[in-house]
């Protein structure tokens, strides 16, 4: 790249470089540099998994630095599937929009004694069935717009023994999911003619997301817009200012610019 990075390039006067802020050329160079390494090393690991007749999935959450499912190079890894844990509809769209054979959602609440912020979940005082209903209501509307192949839960299975109402509700969720998936197998969902573009610095690289889950980024307008759009019957694309310069707006009816 012809130059050295400095500490300030990362610290950015204390603002860091979270993706709900505009980036710069150095940030883009760093992301490309890391992406090159992760692809080259990750592909070796995936080939190793495949050599034993197994499939390789990537968990699109806790740490996906250098994976970049939306930068056009994700297919170079050779992953067989993508797993995304979801609280909200936009996260379901984030998973569904990646070009990979299998898309899977990990539903909340996780099978842990406590949940967000230390609140009781699968323990005295918890109501995991109510939590599951709240999250499923948000996720389900997005599933009607984009196909997901599988759903699942994570955690300690024995914890559900004392919560039969949770087990009954998850059975209902599974049945609803199978029905929704069958709709997608039958054909594309209905869309009205309106074509919406969300415009910000990152464009398609940060389709359907900012810097984390809804409860971590609720203070930013853009996450609310993403969530609203995730279940609406409109065509949605994420575009950058460079895309605008190249004439992409000729194929767009509504432009939303709600970045920082």
Predicted regions and their residues:
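Polysaccharide-binding and catalytic clefts of secreted carbohydrate-active enzymes
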Residues: 1-94, 186
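Carbohydrate-binding surfaces of carbohydrate-active enzymes
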Residues: 43, 50-51, 62, 88-111, ...
């Amino acid at each position: 790249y012809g130059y050295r990075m400095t500490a300030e390039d990362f610290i950015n006067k204390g603002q860091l470089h979270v993706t709900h802020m505009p980036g710069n050329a150095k940030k883009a160079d760093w992301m490309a540099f890391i992406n090159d390494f992760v692809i080259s090393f990750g592909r070796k690991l995936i080939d190793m998994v495949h050599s034993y007749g197994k499939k390789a999935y990537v968990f699109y959450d806790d740490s996906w630095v250098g994976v970049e499912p939306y930068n056009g190079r994700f297919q170079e890894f050779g992953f067989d599937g993508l797993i995304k844990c979801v609280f909200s509809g936009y996260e379901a769209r984030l998973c569904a929009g990646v070009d990979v054979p299998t898309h899977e959602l990990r539903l909340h609440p996780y099978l842990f004694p406590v949940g967000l912020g230390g609140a009781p979940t699968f323990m005295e005082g918890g109501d995991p069935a109510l939590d599951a209903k709240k999250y499923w209501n948000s996720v389900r509307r997005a599933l009607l717009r984009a196909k997901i192949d599988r759903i699942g839960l994570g955690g300690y299975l024995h914890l559900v023994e004392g919560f039969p109402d949770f087990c009954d509700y998850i059975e209902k969720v599974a049945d609803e999911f199978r029905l929704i998936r069958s709709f997608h197998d039958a054909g594309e969902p209905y869309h009205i003619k309106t074509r919406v573009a969300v415009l910000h610095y990152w464009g398609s690289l940060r389709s359907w997301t900012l810097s984390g889950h809804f409860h971590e980024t609720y203070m930013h307008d853009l996450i609310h817009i993403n969530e609203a759009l995730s279940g609406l019957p409109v065509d949605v694309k994420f575009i950058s200012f460079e895309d605008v310069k190249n004439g992409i707006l000729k194929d767009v009816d509504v432009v939303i610019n709600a970045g920082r």
